[in-house]
Amino acid sequence: MSIFRLSRTFSLETCLKSSSFKIRWRFFSVSYASRKLASEDNKPSIQEVVRGIPQNRVRNWAVIAHIDHGKSTLSDCILKLTGVINEHNFRNQFLDKLEVERRRGITVKAQTCSMIYYYHGQSYLLNLIDTPGHVDFRAEVMHSLAACEGCILLVDASQGIQAQTLSNFYMAFSQNLVIIPVLNKVDLPTADVDRTLIQVQQTFDIPMSKPILVSSKTGKNVEQILPEIIQKIPPPKGSENAPLRCLLIDSWYNSYQGVIGLVRIMEGFIKKGGKVMSVNTGRKYEVQQVGIMYPDMTEVSRLRAGQVGYIIWNMKNIDEAIVGDTYSTIGSNVEALPGFSIPQSMVYVGAFPLDGSDYERLNDNIEQLALNDRAINVQKENSSALGMGWRLGFLGTLHLSVFIDRLKDEYGKELLITSPTVPYRIKYKNGREEVISNPNLFPTNHQGISELLEPTVDATIITPSEYLGDVIKLCESCRGLQKDCTYMSESRCMIKYQLPLAHLVEDFFGRLKGTTSGFATLDYEESDYVPADLVRLSIFMSGKSVDALCSIVHRSLALQRGREWIQRLKPLVPKQLYEVILQAVIDNRVVARESISALRKNVTAKCYGGDVTRKQKLLNKQKEGKKRLKSVGNVSIDKSVFYEFLTKKQSN
């Protein structure tokens, strides 16, 4: 009995103590939560923080590197480090907003993000621009660097300096930007930090006594980058009290808000309700909203000199947003800023809807994509075989491929794309010159022509030295002209060739990767037009030219290509009621021929016997009918045949 009372007493006391502890803990929790909420209420908003940062604590900088050297991964680390993104909203390649970018693992569009960084007790506004690494998107890099005072040059410690590393360095150097080299992927077993440091110092003449060695994958030493940016990259120039001058560096279209512009404020300020005008065109707009990318569109009260942000300005016509244009306050007499040179298209294709009824809608979709990528050249054209379509110009084959993917991802549309061609120049004896980007306009009769010229590129190839001989053979087979060959180290060399652009379009990069087991890198820039022996290769069906299959080739390749195309096309063309003749024609001369037999119909099936002349009469009647049909009829070819043929040819 006593044991029972003791246990009851102990249990009661324990419960009372526990209840008292719980009451006290709950009171403490409520009190702590109240203080925490109060502190959060007192915490200034991002708009207030940005408004309080003076111009001398603003830094505009970009990340440039060769493709796949870790630019986007490094940007992710820096955004997490500064608190712009956290574990809840984080995803890999955070700034890569396009589906094609995340699927392919490459950056296509330069993306901007602002961040707040506290250094030595002061807040800094850091505007980061993540740039593409592929040569086809060089224009994006150029536009991005125009908005910066400095950049991070990222180099893969396992691969060293690559072709696009050189190109991006000289692009930044030509704009007098502060360049901070950073070695990435130092945690890899294949990383050779010492060798890469020597390469950077010797190639770029940059002292590497205190190198920044990071791993964007693990986050190692990434925190060392931001203090370097603050200390070495100067703040932007320009007075907030001066008349407004802002540079349009990018634009995109929103169905509800119209054209949205990304601008760098060079002088003055801009705010909601302001009236601005284009210095070049004189068109006027009312500003509906201004803000920064943090990381998404975040409205602020005003954008001041030195800042990078977006403007919603009631612009409905997508043709009015000209990248590189200068905007100022209405009534201000200011000088236009140096704009951007429009990049010249290097690859042209014919594009046609698979369904003719989609033409108008596709036209709107293509114009909206062209607004977001001014390097795309769009012209309408008509094909007798494929109907209404467009002649599209791109900076390269990857640029073309990304455009096709974006059209499918963002609008659910597909196009029938003809063979890529390059712009050729024709000089006539009377002094006139003409540039031809459509093969159907290339003359078959060379009378009156003094010279035919094709575009070339200056290609820079960096390859392991053991593949040097194979690379030279590949370039020579593409009619290349060697310009230089230097050894960067005992194991790597850099070779420069002048190559016909037409060969570069025809999967030269893929062949280069196959020749060097994927170790070679390629960069190129536009070079001169040189004389070439060019001919037009036409495909005829039953005596009529098929304009969708026309191309311009060098005479040395024309015969082989004509035979290949005819043999590949033959099994795809459906049989007709009469024989169909396929011909490859060069300079009005047939160089390859195939025939597709007619559909057979047994017209004598009902004749079971009797005079043989009855059967002969029916056969002759059928023969005359086929002859008459052949003389007046057209070969009916569905678009799916062209789609299959062109798709196979491009994949090969």
UniProtKB/Swiss-Prot annotation:
<keyword id="KW-0472">Membrane</keyword>
<feature type="binding site">
    <location>
        <begin position="130"/>
        <end position="134"/>
    </location>
    <ligand>
        <name>GTP</name>
    </ligand>
</feature>
<dbReference type="InterPro" id="IPR009000">
    <property type="entry name" value="Transl_B-barrel_sf"/>
</dbReference>
<keyword id="KW-0648">Protein biosynthesis</keyword>
<keyword id="KW-0496">Mitochondrion</keyword>
<keyword id="KW-0999">Mitochondrion inner membrane</keyword>
<protein>
    <recommendedName>
        <fullName>Translation factor guf1, mitochondrial</fullName>
        <ecNumber>3.6.5.-</ecNumber>
    </recommendedName>
</protein>
<keyword id="KW-0547">Nucleotide-binding</keyword>
<dbReference type="InterPro" id="IPR006297">
    <property type="entry name" value="EF-4"/>
</dbReference>
<dbReference type="InterPro" id="IPR035647">
    <property type="entry name" value="EFG_III/V"/>
</dbReference>
<keyword id="KW-0342">GTP-binding</keyword>
<dbReference type="Pfam" id="PF06421">
    <property type="entry name" value="LepA_C"/>
</dbReference>
<dbReference type="GO" id="GO:0003746">
    <property type="term" value="F:translation elongation factor activity"/>
</dbReference>
<dbReference type="GO" id="GO:0005525">
    <property type="term" value="F:GTP binding"/>
</dbReference>
<feature type="binding site">
    <location>
        <begin position="65"/>
        <end position="72"/>
    </location>
    <ligand>
        <name>GTP</name>
    </ligand>
</feature>
<dbReference type="InterPro" id="IPR000640">
    <property type="entry name" value="EFG_V-like"/>
</dbReference>
<feature type="transit peptide" description="Mitochondrion">
    <location>
        <begin position="1"/>
        <end position="44"/>
    </location>
</feature>
<feature type="domain" description="tr-type G">
    <location>
        <begin position="56"/>
        <end position="237"/>
    </location>
</feature>
<dbReference type="GO" id="GO:0005739">
    <property type="term" value="C:mitochondrion"/>
</dbReference>
<dbReference type="GO" id="GO:0005759">
    <property type="term" value="C:mitochondrial matrix"/>
</dbReference>
<dbReference type="Pfam" id="PF00009">
    <property type="entry name" value="GTP_EFTU"/>
</dbReference>
<dbReference type="InterPro" id="IPR004161">
    <property type="entry name" value="EFTu-like_2"/>
</dbReference>
<dbReference type="GO" id="GO:0005743">
    <property type="term" value="C:mitochondrial inner membrane"/>
</dbReference>
<dbReference type="InterPro" id="IPR005225">
    <property type="entry name" value="Small_GTP-bd"/>
</dbReference>
<keyword id="KW-0378">Hydrolase</keyword>
<dbReference type="GO" id="GO:0045727">
    <property type="term" value="P:positive regulation of translation"/>
</dbReference>
<dbReference type="InterPro" id="IPR027417">
    <property type="entry name" value="P-loop_NTPase"/>
</dbReference>
<keyword id="KW-0809">Transit peptide</keyword>
<dbReference type="GO" id="GO:0003924">
    <property type="term" value="F:GTPase activity"/>
</dbReference>
<comment type="function">
    <text>Promotes mitochondrial protein synthesis. May act as a fidelity factor of the translation reaction, by catalyzing a one-codon backward translocation of tRNAs on improperly translocated ribosomes. Binds to mitochondrial ribosomes in a GTP-dependent manner.</text>
</comment>
<dbReference type="InterPro" id="IPR035654">
    <property type="entry name" value="LepA_IV"/>
</dbReference>
<dbReference type="InterPro" id="IPR000795">
    <property type="entry name" value="T_Tr_GTP-bd_dom"/>
</dbReference>
<dbReference type="GO" id="GO:0070125">
    <property type="term" value="P:mitochondrial translational elongation"/>
</dbReference>
<feature type="binding site">
    <location>
        <begin position="184"/>
        <end position="187"/>
    </location>
    <ligand>
        <name>GTP</name>
    </ligand>
</feature>
<dbReference type="Pfam" id="PF00679">
    <property type="entry name" value="EFG_C"/>
</dbReference>
<dbReference type="GO" id="GO:0097177">
    <property type="term" value="F:mitochondrial ribosome binding"/>
</dbReference>
<dbReference type="InterPro" id="IPR031157">
    <property type="entry name" value="G_TR_CS"/>
</dbReference>
<dbReference type="InterPro" id="IPR013842">
    <property type="entry name" value="LepA_CTD"/>
</dbReference>
<dbReference type="Pfam" id="PF03144">
    <property type="entry name" value="GTP_EFTU_D2"/>
</dbReference>
<comment type="similarity">
    <text>Belongs to the TRAFAC class translation factor GTPase superfamily. Classic translation factor GTPase family. LepA subfamily.</text>
</comment>
<dbReference type="InterPro" id="IPR038363">
    <property type="entry name" value="LepA_C_sf"/>
</dbReference>
